[in-house]
Every structure is written in C-alpha cells, then in structure tokens.
C-alpha cells in the first residue's frame, strides 16, 4: 500500500502553502482521503507562479519572484506596471552595449540612471542635460592627472638644481682661467688698500673691525669703497706695482720726517712696523675729522677713470708730494 500524500506532506516547501485546516477536511483526516484532498489545493497556488511576469520579462518560477525585495523601487515599478529599463541599453556617448542599470535618480521612476562600463560614464534618462554623459565621474583619470603634476614638479626641481650646479662650475672655470685656480694666487693679485695709504693716516685700520689679513693682503670693509677696491685687477704687473708702492712709501716717509711736523707724526719712532702700519699719536687730529676729509676727497674722484688717483699715485709710481689736500680741520 503506497501513501502518495505523505511525500507532499513531508516536503518543506508545501508546509506554508497548505493551511492546517485543509488536512482535516470533513473530519476524516489526511490518511483517509489521501492525495485527493491535497492535490486540488496545491495546483491553484502553483498556477500564479507559472503565469508570465506583468512587466514582460517572463516568469521563471518561484525564484524570480523571491529576488525582488518588498518595498523597493523595482517593486513599486512592478506595482505601477512600469517597464524596467533595458539591461543592455546603448551608451549615448560611445554606442556601447556594455551598460548596466544603477538606480532611479531622485527616487523618480521616470529618471533611470545607467552606467557604461566601456567609457566609465554615468547618464540619466529624462533628466535635464543628462541624456549624454559629459566628462567627470572617473576616479582613475584624476589619479593620472595628480601623478603627472608630481612629475612636472620633480622635473622643474631637477632643472633648477642642474642650472645652479652649472653656474657654479662656470664661475670656477672663469676663476681658474684668469687667476690660476688657487685661492692664494687670487688673493696675491688683489692689492691691499693699507699699503697705498699715507703713513699719516694709518690709524684708519682701527676703524675696520672686520678685517681679514692673509699674507699681508686685506680687504677693508669701507662699504662702497670696498667694492671699488675689489674691482681693481692688477694682472701680471702686480709685483712691479708693489715695488713702486714700497718705494713711494719710503720716499714719503723721509719727506715728512724732514718737514719736522711734530703735530702730524712722532719723529722718535722712525722705523715702521713689519706689517705696514705706523704709530699715530697726534692729539690734534681726530678720527672723525680724517674720515670726513677722506670722504670728501673720494666723492669727487671716479675710480673708473684712474683707479690709483684716489691716493694721488700716478702711473709712473711717483711719490706723493702734495700734502695740502688733507689739511687738519680744527
């Protein structure tokens, strides 16, 4: 004896579909009537699942109806008998069918939003100026642009570094070609202004606190005067000019000592010091008066015309005979 109704009763998919009151129809129970009672009740419930879908997509059994979430926009569109957007809609920008439906824009069933996987653009049908996708919306392109900007900045930095190194190499090449490339040889061709000064005004060396002496060569920081002194280029005749200056200094010293001017120089110390500086102990002439006299003398002379005219030294290395230019101001 085969009980055909037991399999239908034990099937878990039929438990919720069949109401409990149907199993005791006419008080006889399920075992008495068997499948004659259950089969007419199960068939009407399976028929709506086999009917075609209202939106025209076709019924796929119970699985198709269970994938739609209740209360979603798709469910609302089905209830309003609105056809769902096409799955393979052509992109209005690249004419590709590799597109997908995303969602309804602004919760409106008349503005479905799609995405093209080929050109990676979004577009919305029914919206204002949104039918054709125009630019933007692609994160990959923005990353590429940021990388290109970083590459441009690194290139500009490398160009500046190479330009500065090229300038340094050019300057070093010029110095080596003109001065021999040695620091001592460069300093040896620069004439110290203290060697050209009259021994009477040698106390001006005390006015320059920032004086660097190297092998009896010094650059006095007189402000604008120091730039003019640094621009003097002796060339190959530096040694002969130094000998002329030494000769001029000794002649000027003997001339002043023969004049007997005790107010200008102390005659008790005839020997100069080894470094080219002389003692000055006159109480009548102050450093301020000497500075003003030198400033007035230098302002009226152009260094470009004759670089040695500011110390009254001619090209033939003659001695300084005129002392009237530097008179004492009392």
From Swiss-Prot:
One of its GO terms (cellular component) is symplast. InterPro entries: Dof (IPR045174), Znf_Dof (IPR003851). This is Dof zinc finger protein DOF2.4. GO terms for biological process: plasmodesmata-mediated intercellular transport; regulation of DNA-templated transcription; root radial pattern formation. PANTHER family: DOF ZINC FINGER PROTEIN DOF1.4-RELATED, DOF ZINC FINGER PROTEIN DOF2.4. Residues 40-55, 146-165 have a biased composition (Low complexity). Keywords: DNA-binding, Metal-binding, Nucleus, Transcription, Transcription regulation, Zinc, Zinc-finger. Transcription factor that binds specifically to a 5'-AA[AG]G-3' consensus core sequence. Probably involved in early processes for vascular development. The PEAR proteins (e.g. DOF2.4, DOF5.1, DOF3.2, DOF1.1, DOF5.6 and DOF5.3) activate gene expression that promotes radial growth of protophloem sieve elements. Triggers the transcription of HD-ZIP III genes, especially in the central domain of vascular tissue. Residues 14-70, 133-165, 255-276 are annotated as: Disordered. A zinc finger (Dof-type) spans 89-143. The gene is DOF2.4. The keyword Metal-binding applies. Specific to the vascular tissues. The PEAR proteins (e.g. DOF2.4, DOF5.1, DOF3.2, DOF1.1, DOF5.6 and DOF5.3) form a short-range concentration gradient that peaks at protophloem sieve elements (PSE). Its main location: nucleus. Residues 14-25, 265-276 have a biased composition (Polar residues). Residues 56-68 have a biased composition (Gly residues). Disruption phenotype: The pear1 pear2 tmo6 triple mutant variably displays reduced radial growth. The pear1 pear2 dof6 tmo6 quadruple mutant plants showed a greater uniform reduction in radial growth, associated with compromised symplastic trafficking. Zn(2+) binds at residues 91, 94, 116, 119. One of its GO terms (molecular function) is zinc ion binding. Pfam families: Zn_ribbon_Dof. Induction: By cytokinin in procambium. Antagonized by the HD-ZIP III proteins and by mobile miR165 and miR166 microRNAs. It is found in: Nucleus; Symplast. It comes from Arabidopsis thaliana.
């Amino acid at each position: 004896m085969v009980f055909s109704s037991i399999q239908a009763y034990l099937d878990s998919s039929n438990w919720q579909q069949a109401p409990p009151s149907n199993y005791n129809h006419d008080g006889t129970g399920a075992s008495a009537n068997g499948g004659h009672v259950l089969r007419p009740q199960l068939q009407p419930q399976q028929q709506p699942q086999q009917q075609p879908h209202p939106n025209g997509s076709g019924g796929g059994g119970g699985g198709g109806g269970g994938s739609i979430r209740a209360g979603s926009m798709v469910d609302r569109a089905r209830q309003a008998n609105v056809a769902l957007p096409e799955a393979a809609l052509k992109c209005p920008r690249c004419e590709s069918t590799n597109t997908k439906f995303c969602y309804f824009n602004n919760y409106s069933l008349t503005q479905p939003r799609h995405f093209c996987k080929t050109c990676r653009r979004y577009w919305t049908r029914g919206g204002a100026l949104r039918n054709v996708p125009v630019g933007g919306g692609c994160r990959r392109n923005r990353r590429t642009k940021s990388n290109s900007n970083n590459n441009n900045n690194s290139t500009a930095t490398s160009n500046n570094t190479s330009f500065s190194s090229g300038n340094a190499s050019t300057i070093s090449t010029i110095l080596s070609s003109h001065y021999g490339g040695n620091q001592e040889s460069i300093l040896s061709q620069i004439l110290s202004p203290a060697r050209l000064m009259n021994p009477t005004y040698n106390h001006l060396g005390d006015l320059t606190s920032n004086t660097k002496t190297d092998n009896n060569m010094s650059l006095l920081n007189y402000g604008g005067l120091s730039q003019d002194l640094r621009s003097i280029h002796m060339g190959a005749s530096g040694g002969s000019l130094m000998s002329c200056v030494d000769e001029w200094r000794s002649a000027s010293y003997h001339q002043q000592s023969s004049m007997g001017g005790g107010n200008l120089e102390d005659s008790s110390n005839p020997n100069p010091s080894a470094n080219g500086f002389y003692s000055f102990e006159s109480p009548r002439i102050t450093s301020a008066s000497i500075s003003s006299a030198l400033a007035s003398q230098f302002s009226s002379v152009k260094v470009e015309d004759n670089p040695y005219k500011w110390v009254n030294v001619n090209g033939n290395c003659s001695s300084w005979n005129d002392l009237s230019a530097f008179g004492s101001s009392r």
